[in-house]
Amino acid sequence: MRHLLLITAFLAMLGPTSAHAEGSESLWDGLQVHGFASQAAIWTSENRFFGNSPETSFAFTEIGLNASLPINPRILLSGQLLARRAGDMYDGTPELDYGLADITLASSNEQRWGVRVGRVKNPLGIYNETRDVPFTRPGIFLPQVIYYDKIRNLALSTDGLMFYGESYIDQGALSLTLGGGQPVIDDNVGWTFLRNNYDGEFQTDNKTGLVQLWYSTPGERFKFGLSGIMLSLRFDPGQHSPLRSGTTDIFYWIASIQYDTEDWTLSAEYLREPLAWDDYGPLFPNFKTTVEGYYLQGTYRIRPNIELLMRYEEGFANRNDRDGVRFSTRTGGLFPPFAGFSKIWTAGLRWDINRQWMVRAEYQRHHGTFVLSFRENPDLGQLREYWNLFAVQAAFRF
């Protein structure tokens, strides 16, 4: 990452020279700065979600500040700092959400080719690139069976390179992105993939790659795409770890489709995620599974500033074990069967008070606990199969 930042700084130094040479306007005239903040209150009938939600949790806060600066017609610098508090998973420490140089290599009326260098948001699915901005999400929470908050950072961004191409024809637009680099790893990785906080740390095993292909009709009324990321994680055990040095291989891919009109939007996505654990030792035997998730979602704008949301989603820790029985048996009954799946109905309301302020309300009916974080729910005996969630959120932007 240090080398990427040096490259970005070098490009920034080149930019002012080009701008002054053109003698037209100051480099800083194109600077844009924006920000947002949101606060939510979350209540659940059972189980912990974004904090101590059975007692009502206020531990979901987002504060972001972003800026963009065109150095010259071919180079755009942009970045965002984000402070995000999400229950026990994220503590609100400000972090670099993204910071990159977008370099156009070739451009015409029919196509554009370029490369993004730095910490780049992964273009996975419909919502991953904009998931941290409350105003661009369809609800307070994204579909958790695909956009996991319990392990958000791993799929969120990459420190590396993203090459992209866009082609514009009479029938619409076609875009392709190819990239690779280092994912962002935090403590939630261990809690999710090893189901505990073992002594040791994860590192990437130099096998990270990303691809995205999108097609959209003119006006983007209809669009569909395929996107995926492949990575290998290596666990380096600490002195007191009962595990050996093992690897977890991940192939996370999404098929997406969306139809948009003036008053309503229909979206559907399908996730498949093959996983393989190897060489962790007898406490965590070698194992392979394929996670599966999908949702169907509709939003309807009854007024320009009022929007209704309805969504149904399902997710499974093993697509061949949809009732979770084999999952529970494999762990000796430590995990209840319903920890292997989630089936969720969601209804929501959005009200844009004005351009700066928005409020939301959302209700969810859950069957299963697959989407929950083990970090927030370490006592598996306290988990309940059926539970409700109600949340409200206020958001501001400038």
What are these regions (language model features)?
Residues 13-54, 126, 337, 353-357, ...:
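Outer-membrane beta-barrel biogenesis signature
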Residues 128-131, 189-191, 321-323, 373:
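Short aromatic-enriched loop/helix-cap "lid" or pocket-rim segments at secondary-structure transitions
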Residues 1-24, 139:
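Cleavable N-terminal export/targeting peptides
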Residues 173-177, 187-192, 237-238, 280:
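A short secondary-structure junction signal
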Residues 192-237:
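Loop-centered beta-sheet repeat module
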Residues 51-52, 100-103, 225-398:
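Outer-membrane beta-barrel pore domains
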